[in-house]
C-alpha cells in the first residue's frame, strides 16, 4: 500500500517542469486604442432619450425627427429597420411591465427574491 504511493510521489518529483510564459496577442496600448475607436464608431447611435421621444411622438413629428437625424448622422438614413422597431417594442414592454411588477409585490424584501424549485417566489429577508 505504501509502495504505490511512494512510487507516484517519486514520479511526480522526477517529471520535468517546464516554465511557460503567457503573452497577450496585442500590446495593451493597441487594445486601448482599439476600444477607443470602437466606442467612437458607436457615438452616433440613438440614446435612450431619443428612443423615448420617438416612441411618444406623433407620426408627423416622427418623420421630422427621422429626417433631422438623417441630416445630422448620414448613417441613420436607412435606420428605421427591424432593429429600431425591436428597440421600440422593448422600451414599450419595459414601461408596461413596471407597474405590473410593483402591484405583484416583486420588489419587497431586503435581499431580493428567491425562485423556489417548484416555481413559487419567496422573499429572502426582512
UniProtKB/Swiss-Prot annotation:
It is found in: Secreted. Residues 23-104 form a propeptide. Its main location: secreted. One of its GO terms (biological process) is cGMP biosynthetic process. GO terms for molecular function: hormone activity. GO terms for cellular component: extracellular region. Residues 1-22 form the signal peptide. It comes from the Eukaryota. Keywords: Cleavage on pair of basic residues, Disulfide bond, Hormone, Secreted, Signal, Vasoactive. Disulfide bonds join 110-126. Belongs to the natriuretic peptide family. Exhibits natriuretic and vasodepressant activity. Has cGMP-stimulating activity. May help to regulate body fluid homeostasis in a variety of aquatic environments. This is C-type natriuretic peptide 1. The gene is cnp-1.
